[in-house]
């Protein structure tokens, strides 16, 4: 059994971490992006399917390519962020299952059911996006996840001719706390949970 993490770590990952809308002018290195991935990849997915594929948009040219897909409320903060991660899912993720899950013929579970494959890829890539957020926080970075964008435009701009489809965007950098909104409430245990 693992030991509980420290209260300080809990604050870093959960209770004092915030969604950021403004960014300090501090770059995020490619080495740091590798560190983020090398942490997040260990988060669990069903049958170790690991369907998420990530494009780290970090150049002015990349941001301009992303611009037409962004909602007006997400435009300025995304263009200002050092990095925007496009979290996508591979619609043919199951082709890697003989390598990732060699305990049986897991590939056939999904080749025989396209609907199951899509549902599995979308759900598990969303889980992996959460792991990316926690990996960023563990490394001292801040994030701003967003679903306010045109997925079709992102897919056309970045994934034409591939098996990838976008799920969500996550801005990554060193946040400007002066631009953080006031802390919003969360649902209580009684409101959100049941015991049976």
UniProtKB/Swiss-Prot annotation:
Keywords: Flavoprotein, FMN, NAD, NADP, Oxidoreductase. One of its GO terms (molecular function) is 3-hydroxypropionate dehydrogenase (NADP+) activity. GO terms for biological process: nitrogen utilization; uracil catabolic process. InterPro entries: Nitroreductase, Nitroreductase-like, Nitroreductase_HadB/RutE, RutE-like. Coiled coil: none annotated. Its cofactor is FMN. It catalyses: 3-hydroxypropanoate + NADP(+) = 3-oxopropanoate + NADPH + H(+). CDD domains: RutE-like. May reduce toxic product malonic semialdehyde to 3-hydroxypropionic acid, which is excreted. Belongs to the nitroreductase family. HadB/RutE subfamily. This is Probable malonic semialdehyde reductase RutE. The gene is rutE.
């Amino acid at each position: 059994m693992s030991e509980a993490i420290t209260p300080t770590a809990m604050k870093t990952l959960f209770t004092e971490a915030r969604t950021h809308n403004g960014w300090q002018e501090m770059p995020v290195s490619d080495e740091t992006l590798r560190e983020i991935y090398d942490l997040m990849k260990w988060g669990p997915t069903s049958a170790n399917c690991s369907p998420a594929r990530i494009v780290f948009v970090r150049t002015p040219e990349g941001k301009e390519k992303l611009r037409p897909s962004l909602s007006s409320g997400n435009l300025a903060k995304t263009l200002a962020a050092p990095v925007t991660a496009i979290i996508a899912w591979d619609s043919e993720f199951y082709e890697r299952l003989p390598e990732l899950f060699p305990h049986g013929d897991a590939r056939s579970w999904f080749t025989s059911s396209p609907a199951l494959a899509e549902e599995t890829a979308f759900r598990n890539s969303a889980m992996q996006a959460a792991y990316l957020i926690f990996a960023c926080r563990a490394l001292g970075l801040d994030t701003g996840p967003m679903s306010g964008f045109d997925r079709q435009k992102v897919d056309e701009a970045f994934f034409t001719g591939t098996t990838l489809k976008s799920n969500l965007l996550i801005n990554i950098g060193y946040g400007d706390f002066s631009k953080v909104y006031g802390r919003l409430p969360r649902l209580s245990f009684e409101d959100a949970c049941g015991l049976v």
